[in-house]
A protein has these predicted regions:
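Cytosolic catalytic regions of ATP/NTP-dependent phosphoryl-transfer enzymes
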Residues: 210-218, 333-512, 518, 531, ...
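Helix-interface capping motifs at the ends of transmembrane segments in multi-pass membrane proteins
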Residues: 73-98, 261-299, 312-322, 498-501, ...
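Soluble-to-membrane junctions at the N-terminal ends of transmembrane alpha-helices
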Residues: 44-76, 118, 140-141, 201-210, ...
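Acidic, divalent-metal-coordinating active-site segment for phosphoryl/phosphodiester hydrolysis
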Residues: 527-529, 535, 547-558, 595-603, ...
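Hydrophobic alpha-helical transmembrane segments
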Residues: 95-129, 136, 246-339, 516, ...
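Alpha-helical transmembrane segments of multi-pass membrane proteins
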Residues: 64-84, 100-110, 129-130, 260-278, ...
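Membrane-embedded transport module
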Residues: 273, 277, 304, 311-313, ...
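Non-lumenal N-terminal regulatory segments of integral membrane proteins
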Residues: 1-140, 146-149, 154-162, 167-247, ...
Length: 886
């Protein structure tokens, strides 16, 4: 079988018939049997998204991370000291076994949760299908792109994403954007084999007749033969190269910052604890194990699982609300946006455009204008937009009553066309009638139509387009625009030569025959949706290619501020500094090109905003790519769906409100876990430092620290499902590592104060009361004294960490103004009770814990009450000082 490059070169050099025959194809396309044969021979049209990990590799990845490596290192050191170096008969592998079991337990939970999340993400991705038009057995069919095979004939037009590497057999004004492959920003014209003047065989990307998977059609049409599919395509080769490089999102970068913050803190605290304990007790091996345990105590081991569970839960909930999250992290990014930029059509309006009036230049109904508009819309081969469909629909209705617009598709023949592009903002078709008369009919934005017209037609009379006539036309159209009607101009010229290769330059000296007034009424839900988004701290900005009059009329109906409208021409005249100010004070931008839309979004981001962009057209793809969150709809063109992070199954701003809320819930519950866990653990470290200096023994055994940390983490497993206060959801939420550091510094030391109070109670009251004596270093009774002391702090630490969850999860008064979810209460209290009853159960001797008396628990209740009261006071001060909570 030929290599990919050999197939490309052969297709460029051989005759069309030979190339088709090489792949069992013809101008009628493949048969079903040939499809299966070619799929078997050349493979499926699916890109491998990196090498999929085996189940065993995924299990290992779930278990092994920097924190569990430390745990396993502690287990190994414990095994050496307590088994290999122990005296005969005193071997005790308990600590090592417990650590290994806890590592496997936490890793197993993470593995199961990530497996469920991956399955959910896979199910969501199946809801969005990109399709292509193929010719098989002489008939056109729309099929998913992964069903395309080598040898298929495919039809391509504006808005399509090219689904495989192809050679063009027929083309007309076919322009492709292939910056994703070449880095070249300008669209490139591709021509079919018979029109090509030269083919660059050394650099196939520059070949005139080859087009490649992943590039998108800007304008024109083509019929192409599929040469290469799947991983063998140019895009497939690049995918294989970059699969190991995954650019982190802003959310991932912040999470990495948080992880490194904890690691740096651990690297500072561990040596301090190690040296203090080593110098105090002289047992450097025990000091090393304890110091490593302190490191583990600082780390939220369940953080990856909490993040994954939170994002997956949010995505699944959004799927039920007709929102598909293509990338899990996008759900959190959606909650962070403070500006939503969107096109007007279909978002503010009903996306069901109706042709209200085909008018002559004086604003009178004229079906001859509709007749010419129909020829333009019907015969053009590009992407038929809503206005094209409205023209065709109106003509079909009028044809039942009026001869002038009847049977046009039969009485005219298409000769050529000049496809639409965003620079000209118009498109032309060249047609021939039954008498052989060749005409060009052009339709487009009125300003552009006036620019190419030299005459106007009124009641079959052709007169020059004078300045006075131009002003009359513009005044008439302005009145229509003020009513919210969108207007296109229609021009023509006749008596053209057949067989001539028409060019854009031929769109000149035309006759303006009239214009078309379209109604695209506002959605009833648009105004309430904009108000709701504003309540959630999200400003809506309109970025449209439509003219300012229509845009103003629609925006006023939905309650948007339109005191100032900035036009595309204004944007081009502004420096970056001037634009930085303009985008802050302007809500509506009109007559924009795709590049101008993207520039506005980039400037908003440079100003510090988190920006979402919602669109569904070819011209929206650049904006979606540069926005923090790209949002599209399932009916969008392929390139828009491919670029988007979020896809709405219902194009309605009201749906986005649910996405914002869910994104902020995800943020809230992840932040709760990180801030509460890190601050509690940070407080424990202060307590350990104090104890290491003033106590003649370790305040908690290494195994106690590890069990405490992991039981607490496991008890937080329900936090992704916690309730979130409505007030908290009203503002955009952005990850900031510095706020975690500040939170930790404020609330960590508070717990240390009450830990020290617990130390005093245990050392001077409770333990002497139970044992009948105080601590005597080296005495036989010292072991029981130490065990009781360590048990007391072990239990107090778990209860204080558990109770503070209820105090810190909300700025409001717990249980009165804000209640946690039942699942959160159940898991956290279960964890606290488990630790409390360990000294009374069969694991007591293994964990080296001992029962305490009733007085201890009575005093513990008092300590916890004082701790909760102190946290409440500091919380109110903190909120007043920093004007934020989580």
């Amino acid at each position: 079988m030929q290599t990919t490059k050999e197939r490309f070169i052969a297709a460029l050099q051989d005759a069309e018939t030979t190339t088709l025959a090489n792949y069992q194809s013809s101008w009628s396309g493949l048969t079903e049997d040939q499809v299966e044969e070619n799929r078997e021979s050349y493979g499926e049209n699916v890109l491998t998204k990196g090498q999929e990990s085996s189940i065993w590799k995924r299990i290992v990845e779930s278990i092994i991370n920097p924190f569990t490596v430390i745990l396993l290192l502690i287990a190994l050191v414990s095994l050496v000291t307590n088994v290999w170096l122990a005296k005969p008969g005193e071997e005790d592998p308990t600590t090592s076994l417990i650590i290994v079991v806890l590592v496997l337990l936490s890793g197993g939970i993470r593995f199961v949760q990530e497996l469920r999340s991956d399955k959910a993400a896979s199910n969501l991705s199946r809801m969005i299908v990109n399709t292509a038009t193929v010719i098989r057995e002489g008939k056109e069919a729309e099929i998913p792109i992964d069903e395309i095979v080598v040898g298929d004939l495919i039809k391509l037009s504006a808005g399509d994403m090219i689904p495989a590497d192809v050679v063009l057999l027929d083309s007309r004004d076919f322009f492709v954007q292939q910056s994703g492959l070449t880095g070249e920003s300008d669209a490139v014209e591709k021509v079919c084999l018979k029109k090509a003047t030269s083919q660059n065989l050394d650099s196939l990307l520059e070949s005139e007749s080859l087009a490649f998977m992943g590039t998108n059609v800007i304008s024109g049409r083509a019929t192409a033969l599929v040469l290469v599919v799947g991983d063998e395509t140019m895009m497939g080769a690049i995918e294989q190269t970059i699969n190991t490089y995954d650019e982190p999102t802003s959310f991932e970068r912040e999470m990495n910052t948080i992880s490194w913050l904890l690691i740096r803190l651990m690297m500072v605290m561990v040596p301090i604890v190690f040296f203090i304990n080593g110098l105090t007790d002289g047992d450097w091996l025990e000091a090393g194990v304890f110091a490593l345990s302190v490191g583990v105590g600082l780390t939220p081991e369940m953080l990856p699982m909490i993040i994954t569970a939170s994002l997956a839960k949010g995505s699944i909930i959004m799927a039920k609300e007709k929102v598909v999250i293509k990338k899990l992290n996008a759900i959190q990014d959606l909650g962070a946006i403070d500006i939503l930029c969107t096109d007007k059509t279909g978002t503010l309006t009903q996306d069901e455009i109706v042709l209200e009036y085909p008018l002559d230049i004086h604003g009178e109904l004229d079906l001859s204008v509709l007749r010419r508009a129909y020829l333009n819309s019907y015969f053009q081969t590009g992407l038929k937009n809503l206005m094209d469909r409205a023209i065709i629909s109106r003509t079909e209705r009028e044809a039942k009553k009026h001869e002038i617009v009847r049977g046009l598709d039969q009485s005219f023949q298409k000769i050529d066309e000049l496809p639409f592009d965003f620079e000209r903002r118009r498109m032309s078709v060249i047609v021939k009638d039954e008498q052989g008369l060749v005409s060009m009919v052009t339709k487009g934005a009125l300003e552009e139509m006036l620019a190419v017209s030299r005459y106007v037609e009124y009641k079959d009379e052709i007169i020059p387009l004078t300045d006075q006539v131009r002003e009359e036309v513009l005044a008439e159209v302005a009145q229509l625009n003020e009513q919210g009607l969108r207007v296109l101009g229609v021009s023509y010229k006749s008596n053209l030569e057949e067989g001539y290769a028409f060019e854009v330059a031929d769109e000149a000296d035309m006759i303006l025959t009239g214009y078309l007034a379209f109604l695209d009424p506002p959605k009833p839900s648009a105004a309430p949706a904009i108000n709701i988004l504003a309540e959630y701290g999200v400003a809506t900005k309109i970025l449209t290619g439509d003219n300012e009059k229509v845009t103003q009329a629609v925006c006023e109906k939905v309650g948007l501020d339109v005191d100032r409208i900035l036009l595309g021409s204004d944007i081009d005249s502004l420096s970056d500094q001037e634009l930085a100010q303009a985008v802050e004070t302007t809500t509506v931008f009109a007559k924009l090109s795709p590049d101008q839309k993207a520039r506005i979004i980039l400037q908003l981001k440079a100003n510090g905003h988190k920006v979402g962009y919602m669109g569904d057209g070819i011209n929206d793809a650049p904006s979606m790519k540069v926005a923090d969150v790209g949002i599209s709809v399932d009916t969008a063109v392929d390139i828009a769906k491919e670029t988007a992070d979020v896809i709405l199954l219902d194009k309605d701003l009201m749906v986005l409100e649910k996405g914002l809320v869910e994104g902020r819930k995800v943020y809230a519950n992840m932040t709760k876990y990180i801030k509460m866990t890190v601050s509690s653990n940070f407080g424990n470290i202060f307590s350990l430092l104090f104890a290491s200096i003033f106590l003649p023994f370790l305040p908690m055994a290494p195994i106690h620290l590890i069990v405490l940390n992991l039981v607490y983490d496991l008890s937080c497993i329900a936090l992704p499902f916690d309730r979130v206060d409505k007030d908290f959801l009203k503002k955009p939420r952005i990850w900031e590592a510095k706020s975690i550091t500040r939170f930790m510094a404020w609330f960590g030391p508070i717990s240390s104060v009450f830990d020290i109070l617990t130390f005093i109670i245990l050392y001077f009251v409770i333990v002497p009361m139970i044992t009948g004596y105080g601590y005597v270093h080296g005495a036989d009774s010292a072991g029981l004294f130490i065990m009781l002391f360590q048990t007391g702090w072990f239990i107090e630490s778990m209860w204080s960490q558990t109770m503070v969850i209820y105090m810190l999860r909300s700025p409001k008064l717990p249980f009165v103004q804000s209640r946690p979810a039942f699942a959160v209460m159940a898991t956290t209290l279960l964890g606290a009770l488990l630790v409390t009853f360990l000294p009374y159960g069969p694991l007591a001797s293994l964990l080296k814990v001992a029962p305490l008396n009733a007085l201890y628990f009575l005093l513990l209740a008092g300590v916890l009450f004082l701790y909760m009261a102190s946290v409440t006071l500091v919380k109110h001060y903190y909120i007043g000082k920093y004007k934020e909570w989580l």
